[in-house]
A protein has these predicted regions:
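Catalytic core of pol beta-like nucleotidyltransferases
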Residues: 1-26, 34-40, 49-97
Length: 97
């Protein structure tokens, strides 16, 4: 099983943000913190698979993540708005948060 390399306390903060802002959304992590080739300064790459709510904005979600106490950079995008080739790469290895 693929693992997300994030401390439990940081994962809890992220899950709390997602639960409060977009409880119906599915959030995927991918990249070095999933593949295992990360270091302490690595960012966390994430995508929103689907907001399931037209009133939610990726910009607002980014701001909530940036305002959190998580001590590393995070990047989040909408999966459906990424190029097909990038979606294919993400689908090879990801973790649902």
């Amino acid at each position: 099983m693929t693992k997300l390399n994030v401390k439990p306390e940081h994962l809890k903060i992220l899950r709390d943000i997602f639960e409060q802002y977009c409880p119906k959304a599915e959030i995927w992590a991918y990249g070095s913190r999933v593949k295992g080739d990360f270091h302490d300064g690595s960012d966390l790459d994430m995508v929103v698979k689907s907001f399931n709510d037209e009133n939610k904005s990726i910009t607002e979600l980014r701001q909530l993540l940036n305002d959190s106490n998580v001590p590393f950079l995070m990047d989040i995008a909408e999966f459906d708005k990424l190029p097909d080739s990038f979606q294919t790469e993400i689908l090879k290895e990801y973790v649902i948060i």
